[in-house]
């Protein structure tokens, strides 16, 4: 059975006051790296990190080492993502994986190797992270969100990143998990439930842009998913208790193709550097005025 999690986990630690919430967003997750660098340079460090999908990757690195140097390390990780084999390879290779699996296009092995290479030696379990950390995945068997707050770190992150159709479901214990964005894409409510009073939301820019009516067949599902993910975030924001302060950090605007289809491109890593720089400048300016 997968290790369970609720808001009472790690009760021996003091309640967090400052949380970093890192949302999902595929290749657009590079924006979060610029935001992290701006936060850490401003002397803002988290007592709690929660993440979804690509935000689970960025969040794990900063929870392992909440320093400017870690943000710079993340920038290096993003610079190498296009060459890492995570979402690369020939069409023939993808078709071979799809033919064998009948469910997905890519192996999760390159992503596992990348995570293991960028996490500190000896940090194998979530409990070993210096900063309390949780990431979310969607349980197939229970059709519900599942929060990982202890157990093998890389397995939890892989579960949170298992994009349907691209990567295989990840088995942890007796359950199988898919991408956390299916259940909770920007988990502000989780951070608040765990006690955070100041929340910094690191998002990839989607919620800054209005949705448009789909005009092509493949845009229909994308728009439907965006409505679902934004509705959950809007509900969390509407339900904030008194005394909780939330900072929605700016992404600096879109880089590359705009529109719903452009936002959901998962292999567009070539623009990572520009996305990091824009988000860094925008967030640094926001923090200076806050």
Residues of each region from the PLM?
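Patatin-like phospholipase
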Residues: 1-52, 60-290
């Amino acid at each position: 059975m997968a290790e369970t999690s609720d808001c009472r986990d790690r009760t021996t630690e003091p309640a967090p006051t400052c949380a970093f919430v890192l949302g999902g967003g595929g290749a657009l997750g590079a924006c979060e790296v610029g935001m992290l660098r701006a936060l850490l340079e401003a002397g803002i460090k988290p007592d709690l990190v929660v993440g979804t999908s690509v935000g689970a990757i960025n969040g794990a690195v900063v929870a392992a080492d909440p320093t400017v140097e870690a943000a710079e390390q993340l920038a290096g990780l993003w610079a190498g993502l296009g060459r890492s084999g995570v979402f690369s390879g020939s069409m023939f290779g993808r078709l071979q994986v799809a033919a064998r699996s009948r469910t997905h296009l890519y192996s999760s092995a390159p992503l596992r190797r990348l995570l293991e290479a960028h996490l500190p030696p000896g940090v194998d379990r979530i409990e070993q992270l210096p900063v309390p950390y949780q990431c979310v995945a969607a349980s197939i068997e229970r059709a519900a969100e599942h929060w990982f707050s202890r157990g093998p770190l890389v397995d939890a992150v892989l579960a949170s990143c298992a994009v349907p159709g691209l990567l295989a479901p990840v088995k942890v214990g007796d359950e199988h998990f898919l991408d956390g964005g299916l259940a909770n894409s920007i988990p502000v409510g989780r951070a608040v439930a765990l006690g955070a009073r100041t929340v910094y939301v690191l998002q990839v820019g989607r919620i800054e842009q209005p949705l448009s009516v789909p005009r092509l067949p493949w845009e229909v599902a994308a728009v439907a998913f965006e409505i679902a993910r934004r509705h959950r975030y809007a509900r969390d924001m509407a339900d904030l208790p008194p005394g909780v302060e939330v900072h929605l950090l700016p992404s600096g605007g879109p880089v590359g193709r705009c529109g719903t289809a452009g936002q959901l491109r998962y292999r567009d890593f070539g623009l990572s550097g520009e996305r990091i720089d824009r988000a860094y400048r925008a967030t640094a300016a926001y923090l200076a005025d806050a």
